[in-house]
Amino acid sequence: MAQVINPISAAEPITYKLWQNSAPTSNGIAKGLEQSDSTGWITFVSEPELTVYPATQPSGTALLLCPGGGYFGLSSLYEGSALAQPLNEIGVTLAVLKYRMPNGHHEVPREDALRALEILNDEASELKIDPEKIGIGGASAGGHLAATVISHPGKIAPAFQVLFYPVITMNEEFSHSGSRNLLLGDKPSENLIEYFSNELHVSSETPPTFIAVSQNDPAVPLRNSTDYFRALVANNVPVSFHVYPTGGHGWLCNPDFAYRNQTLTELTNWLVSFGR
């Protein structure tokens, strides 16, 4: 059983420590260096955690959300816990992952995400979620992590995925250079590039997918999402793909994003339409 850091009453956040002793792979960041600020920006994570925001009237669905931050840090508020209320309102339990950065160890973020899925599965009864209705999602680099888990699942294969302005590929031509360099290093092998280029790993087994992105994203080229969309369609994967004309990158962090309410409505309608 996972170690519960703050066992609080139902419908209040519950935080789990991901690893009881030590993680399989260290990212080389010493304990005690973690920093955070009032915006929810977190850096130097060495002890990853999973914080669950249970729905008061749960439908059984849970979404594991991986905040973005370019594989350097985590936007844990705006791309994490801020989504709890709209999801809880439709019965979806939100779980926000505070994952470790690679720091030269590309396998580390995926290890944390796989472990988080195992915890949600193990604690499903207590959290009132259906093990068959656990999905994964993320924003920006967190979207890359989510899609990577879909491409290379562990013991628990997510039932669906939700991606906001995601990094999808490690192809140098149209990847996000910062995320690529921090995940794979300056001179990654072709095998490593291929492994982490998620548009190359779509199959008929890929679960239903929701993607929301802006056409004028200056940080992550739109081709990340359009190539992924084409691969999903080619493999007959149900996909809901939303491209907004403006918004740039990171608009979950922008309360003035013109399509913010529309995005949340489209997401919640999609989740409900799939019985989630």
Give the ranges of each region predicted by the language model.
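Conserved alpha/beta-hydrolase "acid-adjacent" motif
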Residues: 218-227
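Primarily recognizes the serine-hydrolase "nucleophile elbow" in alpha/beta-hydrolase
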Residues: 115-179, 193-194
